[in-house]
Regions:
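Hydrophobic helical membrane-anchoring modules
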Residues: 1-2, 175-253
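Short beta-strand/loop segment that forms part of the nucleotide-sugar
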Residues: 33-43, 60
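A conserved acidic beta->alpha catalytic loop
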Residues: 40-48, 90
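Glycine-rich, basic loop-to-helix element that forms the pyrophosphate-binding segment
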Residues: 62-78
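Short aromatic/hydrophobic "clamp" motif used to bind/position activated sugar donors
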Residues: 83
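Conserved donor NDP-sugar-binding/catalytic core segment of glycosyltransferases
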Residues: 95-125
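A recurrent flexible, glycine/aromatic-enriched loop bordering the glycosyltransferase active site
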Residues: 112-124, 133-151
């Protein structure tokens, strides 16, 4: 009988109040029920605490804000053998969940991967290139955070996790994961909120993201890039230094 894997879903939250409640409701209805951990660095932690209390979700408070740090700390508290890192503004259905578990149950060589992104929804003008994007992502493309990256827990720690990076943590981890072993990009496609694109425009946002990735590839520090992206000057000055006393796990019952 093939092994049935367990899943821990880690959700980094930074002021995602609008989306968190509905996302937790959807995830709480998955079967078999995964372990769900919200790793929060919001300005108003009390709001997130109340949302997690409503859904009886484990809550992790991480200060100061850093997506890589939030993901790493969430992974440390997780108990399942598969880790799924999922954004609060991204959909995740039973079909996605079944696809994830089935992939590991049927192929013992898989170490991790992500889901295909529905780019037609975000970039309608690029519809003709969606087939190219699919092939590229499945074989050599970077696995971004909004694709719900997943990995065996043992492999995650062997690779050093997200290294606490405040930005480009997904790009960095994707490179390590693809270099290590068999990575699978799964269907069905997932959709994310258009909130970032609606504020700046689709093309401008895409160009901004591409420019940041180019700078990262050229060797610019992720902490400097985080300052540019978030407008938070403290990000570059921290240089990856976080207090070990900044993490608190709350089991909301």
């Amino acid at each position: 009988m093939p092994k049935t894997h367990s899943v821990s879903i880690v959700i980094p939250c930074r002021d995602d109040y609008k989306y968190l409640s509905s996302t937790l409701l959807d995830l709480s209805n998955l079967s078999p029920l995964p372990e769900i951990i919200v790793s929060d660095a919001s300005k108003d932690h009390g709001v997130v605490k109340e949302i997690c209390k409503d859904h009886q979700i484990k809550l992790l408070q991480v200060e100061p804000p850093s997506r890589g740090q939030q993901l790493d700390k969430g992974a440390e508290k997780a108990n399942s053998d598969i880790l799924l890192f999922h954004h609060a503004d991204t959909d995740f259905s039973q079909n996605h969940y079944d696809s994830l578990i089935q992939s590991f149950n049927t192929d013992s060589t898989i170490i991790g991967g992500a889901f295909l992104k529905d780019i037609n929804d975000l970039y309608p003008m690029f519809r003709l290139f969606s087939w190219f994007h699919k092939i590229y992502t499945m074989h050599i493309g970077t696995l971004y955070g909004d694709q719900s990256v997943f990995v065996l827990r043992s492999i995650f720690f062997e690779l050093g996790g997200f290294e606490g990076l405040p930005l480009m943590e997904d790009v960095n981890f994707s490179s390590k994961l693809r270099d290590y072993g068999n990575v699978r990009v799964l269907a069905p496609k997932i959709k994310s909120s258009k909130r970032k694109f609606s504020r700046e425009g689709t093309l401008l946002r895409k160009l901004k993201n591409m420019w940041l990735i180019i700078l990262y590839r050229l060797g610019v520090s992720p902490y400097k890039l985080a300052e540019m992206y978030y407008g938070d000057q403290s990000a570059s000055s921290r240089g990856g230094q976080f207090s070990s006393n900044s993490v608190e796990l709350e089991k909301i019952e």
